[in-house]
């Protein structure tokens, strides 16, 4: 499974005839059903949604309800001295031409009270770093503010939280919360991709570079948050 095979599944199955099938789309439920099938075979592979088999595609898998996904870190001993990857939302509202996240036309949030409970678990265990893999963490300002305020109010003095954000979406309210953070509590990865307006237009990345610059400068002036800016090599123009 995965993006490398999901979009040319039939071609890959024809090329690699030793494969039984390919998982396409979101894999949590599909993989779970596959494990159960091979552990105690019942029914047929064709009954499992989200597969491409030599005989054809099974039923499409519905998008995952983020609030129903289990918490995977109850045994933190397995992850000692490792980065914890955490997802509080899935999808992205933008349509950037280079990004797979643009395919999912919805943003699905994990229940905020569940998120707070799970973040508190990390805080209680003083893990070194939690890296949010939300594609654009602050695309929903209320969701982002709720999490940032919770971390501000429950900081354990140790744990660092990493977020990927769109700086041009930042509000004054969000910036005011970030200004109060302990140095090292959070770090920000900011997607810029290109400073060429023609390039941004060609890849459907619509934003105000001037506003982005102002936000980055303002966060820099706080002297409490490490930020790094992403650029993509090889884009047009």
Q: Predicted regions: what is each one?
A:
Residues 1, 226-227:
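Short beta-strand/loop segments at the ligand-binding rim of alpha/beta enzyme cores
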Residues 1-116, 120:
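Acidic, low-complexity intrinsically disordered segments
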Residues 44-46, 160, 227:
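Acidic/polar loop patches that form or flank catalytic/metal-binding clefts of enzymes
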Residues 70-225, 233-235:
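Radical SAM [4Fe-4S] cluster-binding motif and immediate context
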